[in-house]
Amino acid sequence: MHTVEKIGGTSMSRFEEVLDNIFIGRREGAALYQRIFVVSAYSGMTNLLLEHKKTGEPGVYQRFADAQSEGAWREALEGVRQRMLAKNAELFSSEYELHAANQFINSRIDDASECMHSLQKLCAYGHFQLSEHLMKVREMLASLGEAHSAFNSVLALKQRGVNARLADLTGWQQEAPLPFEEMISSHFAGFDFSRELVVATGYTHCAEGLMNTFDRGYSEITFAQIAAATGAREAIIHKEFHLSSADPNLVGADKVVTIGRTNYDVADQLSNLGMEAIHPRAAKTLRRAGVELRIKNAFEPEHGGTLISQDYKSEKPCVEIIAGRKDVFGIEVFDQDMLGDIGYDMEISKLLKQLKLYVVNKDSDANSITYYASGSRKLINRAARLIEEQYPAAEVTVHNLAIVSAIGSDLKVKGILAKTVAALAEAGISIQAIHQSIRQVEMQCVVNEEDYDAAIAALHRALIEPENHGDVIAAA
């Protein structure tokens, strides 16, 4: 049986190493096949095509959406073209491959440019609104980056004697989009995995519109659906690092250990903290299909990485990972009139959802509720103002916080709460709130934002390092 493997954009930018470590490595003959690869755009390309993920700096899409002038988005699109052509020149030294790579991406960019120009012209008439078509434009632009890296991968593999074949899921010039699952199954029906190494685009054009729901998380959704639809033996995500017991930059590279084995429940907890091993919807697809997920370091191919399965539970209770997130605001709502009235929580939760604020956790007592939410300061302040307007008697306070968590497939460790509190106290860190559910999979400590780094190091030192796990907590 085959595997389905995903390679992220940062790894794809180190393409020669990816060829040597993942695509080919020491494999020969039949060992090269029975694999499907789902590849992302090269690092930075999607930022240029849409907008910068972290800074918000406008790319082609954002300039087009602002519609100030056609020149602005055209200039940005030409800038992307030059970056893509430069990447081609970096990858291919032979004239044939370079010409093929350039011809492919030039054709796609020309088509996109013509389409956007025509749409802008059409929307100059009052009967047509540009805003109604923007999501389609966003998806079309995103697909350029995915198609670029996938086409180049096939070209490079063929150059090295591998029978590689492109699965172009971008729907380019397709008459009408198919439903997502049908789009995947129809594309993969004709492949012979025993003789063909398949490279698929991370973006799938479909009737539902993946970006409507997942925005830039679409590649993992595509990856998971391919694994489920084709009955993969295993799904593998190649990252630039191991799934480790903590961030090595915070606790020291010599202190962290690879997790080795865990379950989808732990992956969900990590996702809730914004430290995604895999998108929760993708995990759900794999889990339902009974496909196990392996997280590997792209640049350590011989290492087994970490295997995530549905039923795994550590042999003895232990903490597997210390993780957290910094960008958390505590919205504290105090109102003595809320005693016994569940309507407060329902209405405020609805308001936060409308503002698209992500609630990591919440706690309450007799007359107060605190929501630990992630989002921009501007939106958080707006939420606080709207809550005050809705409940004039309430006192609403916003706190700058961080959440630090101890997570494990079986966290029923005797005295873990006492150890945690003692470790943070010894590090001079004040706990603002603490959460531990009956299921004993995660324990969250809420601390002041400036204490985040020290709290991660303190908990790793107290809860993981004394166990002397060696290189891996549980071998995959």
UniProtKB/Swiss-Prot annotation:
Induction: Induced in response to osmotic stress.
GO MF: aspartate kinase activity; ATP binding
Keyword Nucleotide-binding: yes
ACT domain ranges (all copies): 405-476
Coiled coil regions, renumbered to chain: none
Key word Kinase present: yes
SUPFAM superfamilies, alphabetized: ACT-like, Carbamate kinase-like
Annotated control of activity: Allosterically and strongly feedback inhibited by tryptophan. The presence of either 650 mM NaCl or KCl reduces the inhibition by tryptophan.
One example of a Gene Ontology biological process annotation: lysine biosynthetic process via diaminopimelate
CDD domains the record matches: ACT_AK-Ectoine_1 (cd04910)
Gene Ontology CC annotations of this record: cytosol
Localization per record: Cytoplasm
Pfam families: AA_kinase, ACT_9
Pathway noted in the entry: Amine and polyamine biosynthesis; ectoine biosynthesis
Keywords: Allosteric enzyme, ATP-binding, Cytoplasm, Kinase, Nucleotide-binding, Transferase
Protein EC: 2.7.2.4
InterPro entries found in the cross-reference section: AceGlu_kinase-like_sf, ACT-like_dom_sf, ACT_Aspartokinase, Asp/Glu/Uridylate_kinase
Entry similarity comment: Belongs to the aspartokinase family.
Record function comment: Involved in the biosynthesis of L-aspartate-beta-semialdehyde, which is an intermediate in the biosynthesis of ectoine, a highly soluble organic osmolyte, called compatible solute. Ectoine is used to avoid excessive water efflux, plasmolysis, molecular crowding of the cytoplasm, and cessation of growth in high salinity environments. Catalyzes the phosphorylation of the beta-carboxyl group of L-aspartate to yield 4-phospho-L-aspartate.
Protein name: Aspartate kinase Ask_Ect
Lineage start: Bacteria, Pseudomonadati, Pseudomonadota, Gammaproteobacteria, Pseudomonadales
Primary gene name: ask
